[in-house]
Design a protein with these regions (language model features):
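Terminal low-complexity tails and localization/encapsulation signals of metabolic enzymes
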Residues: 1-45, 78, 82
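Glycine-rich loop-to-alpha-helix module at the N-terminal edge of alpha/beta enzyme cores
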Residues: 43-129
Length: 129
C-alpha cells in the first residue's frame, strides 16, 4: 500500500482541519505543512488552532468529562473496544502513514499502531474489573 492510497483510506486530504471537539471542527488558524523525512515531499497541510477555538475545545472537553464519568465502566469499555477494532481495521494504512510521516520502517509504523491497539485492549480489561 502506498501513501496516497493510505491517506485516501484514512479520509485525509491535501488540507485537513486540525481541531475538533468530536462534533465541531475549527479551521480558522494558520495552515502548517507536514513533510516526510523519507523524501522531503509535503504530506498535507493542517489548520492550527486559534486561542478562541482552543478555549471552545477545552470547554467542550470539560463538559464531556462530566457526562463521561457518569457512564458505567463496562459501557465506556465497550466504546474503547470499538476504537481498538477501528484501529485494527485501519492498521495497515495507519502503519504506512506513521512510517512515511516519521521516517520509520513500515514494520515500526505497524508496531506503533499495534501499541495503540494494545492500550485499547488493556483499557477494556480494566473496565471489567
Amino acid at each position: 500500500m502506498n501513501i496516497e492510497n493510505s491517506l485516501k483510506e484514512l479520509g485525509l486530504s491535501n488540507h485537513n482541519i486540525g481541531t475538533s471537539t468530536g462534533s465541531n471542527y475549527f479551521s480558522d488558524g494558520e495552515k502548517i505543512s507536514s513533510y516526510s523525512p523519507v523524501d522531503g515531499k509535503e504530506i498535507g497541510t493542517v489548520s492550527t488552532t486559534t486561542f478562541e477555538d482552543y478555549n471552545k475545545v477545552i470547554e467542550s472537553a470539560q463538559s464531556a468529562f462530566k457526562f463521561w464519568r457518569t457512564v458505567p465502566a463496562p459501557q465506556r469499555g465497550e466504546i474503547v473496544r470499538q476504537f481498538g477494532n477501528k484501529l485494527r481495521d485501519l492498521k495497515e494504512p495507519l502503519g504506512v502513514l506513521v512510517s512515511y510521516e516519521m521516517g520509520k520502517s513500515f514494520q515500526e509504523g505497524l508496531g506503533e499502531v499495534q501499541e495503540m491497539i494494545d492500550i485499547c485492549d488493556f483499557a477494556v480489561g480494566l473496565s471489567r474489573q
